[in-house]
Design a protein with these regions (language model features):
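Active-site mouth of glycoside hydrolases
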Residues: 1-242, 248, 253-255, 266, ...
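Aromatic- and carboxylate-lined catalytic core of secreted/periplasmic carbohydrate-active enzymes
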Residues: 3-4, 294-359
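Conserved catalytic-core segment of NTP-binding enzymes
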Residues: 259
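Short active-site alpha-helical segment characteristic of glycosyltransferases
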Residues: 287
Length: 359
């Protein structure tokens, strides 16, 4: 079995890649990743168009998730569509981070095949589907199915230079469910302990395959019950097991700076794989220069305004903010490819150009 990369291996890998200025990606035509990747709704033309826009505005990286349910039902077809997607990203000079699992079932449904429900009016990411699904995560007798999926996808693409890094598991233990524009609830708290064990097992399966790309799982508990920042057991394990450190933070620049300074002590490259919450003072003008100064790759949430409705704020923000509709929460481009804010896109292009010549 392969082992965790050394600090020097991780740093050497990082120096071989441009500073990542990217986004979390679903095309505007997909309400969730199941719809994005199923054969009947895989929209290569829209993906091609949107990645062209992203390149033109200066982006060079993206992060996207894969659905276990589609692999299990249509393994060969999914692998071909992944190859098509990677070809399109390479065409537009965009590095790809693939995420294999995800607990963010904000719809409240277990994942299902076929036509997906339409977005619910006014609700942020209303049909988000997990991978493989919270019920399977909480049933270890089903984990051999997950292991087969992890091993197969990694084996198929373990030497593919179009993939720069694997994110094995997005937000393990996330229990959120969005009920309405201003109301949410949570799934069974027991999910967290199962997700922790599954994440640790997944690192083992992935190391056994031994991909040429590094492995990561993002620490994500910034403000969470009685745990300190990134001190939930899931975060501690993720930070200790990852080849490249990654994390999520939707807070203001002062909080972002504190996290960056803390993670720098680990002597590994750092990626912020989720950020951007304009209503919460997590915006471009302060934070993108901060990521650039720390040489921390960053992936904001969302590219084009679409069926995920992630320009609409989280339920908590909708409930408490005095003017929640005054800003977009996530996302940067209209469905016609025009920027929500021209200055944001000027900053993306300027900083990626600046960093390109300083590695």
């Amino acid at each position: 079995m392969h082992t965790q990369w050394s600090e020097s291996q991780a740093q050497a890998w990082y120096q071989q890649h441009d500073w990542a200025c990217g986004f979390n990606y679903l095309p505007r035509s997909a309400v969730n990743w199941t719809e994005m990747w199923q054969a009947d709704t895989f929209d290569a033309a829209t993906i091609d168009q949107e990645l062209s826009w992203a390149h033109d505005y200066g982006y060079n990286a993206l992060r996207t998730n894969l659905p276990f349910i589609v692999w299990e039902a249509d393994r060969d077809g999914l692998l071909k569509r992944i190859d098509t997607f990677l070809t399109l990203a390479e065409k537009h000079q965009i590095q790809v981070m693939l995420t294999l699992m995800d607990d963010c079932a904000f719809s409240g449904d277990e994942p299902y095949l076929g036509p997906q429900k339409p977005p619910r009016h006014g609700v942020h990411n209303s049909q988000a589907a997990a991978s493989p699904g919270r019920a399977i995560v909480m049933d270890p007798s089903q984990w051999p199915r997950i292991e087969a999926y992890i091993r197969d996808v990694l084996t198929q693409f373990k030497n593919d230079s179009r993939i720069t890094i694997w994110d094995l598991y997005n937000e393990p233990g996330n229990r959120g469910i969005n009920l309405s524009p201003t109301e949410s609830t949570e799934y069974d708290e027991a999910l967290e302990s199962f997700a922790l064990d599954l994440m640790i097992a997944t690192f083992g399966w992935a190391r056994d395959v031994g991909p040429s790309q590094p492995l990561t799982v993002g620490a994500w508990h910034i403000d969470y019950q009685h745990y300190g920042t990134l001190e939930h057991p899931i975060d501690i394990a993720a930070l200790n097991l990852s080849d490249i450190i990654s994390y999520h933070n939707y807070n203001n620049a002062a909080r972002q700076l504190g996290v960056l300074e803390s993670l720098a002590q680990r002597n590994r490259p750092v990626l912020c794989t989720e950020w951007l919450a304009r209503h919460m003072d997590c915006g471009f003008s302060e934070q993108l220069p901060l990521f650039c100064a720390f040489d921390t790759g960053c992936y904001q949430w969302g590219l084009v305004q679409g069926k995920t409705q992630t320009w609409i704020p989280w339920t908590s923000v909708n409930k408490d903010h005095p003017a929640p509709q005054s800003l977009w929460f996530h996302d940067v481009l209209t469905p016609e490819g025009k920027p929500f804010c021209k200055q944001e896109m000027q900053l993306v292009k300027g900083l990626t150009h600046y960093r390109q010549y300083r590695r």
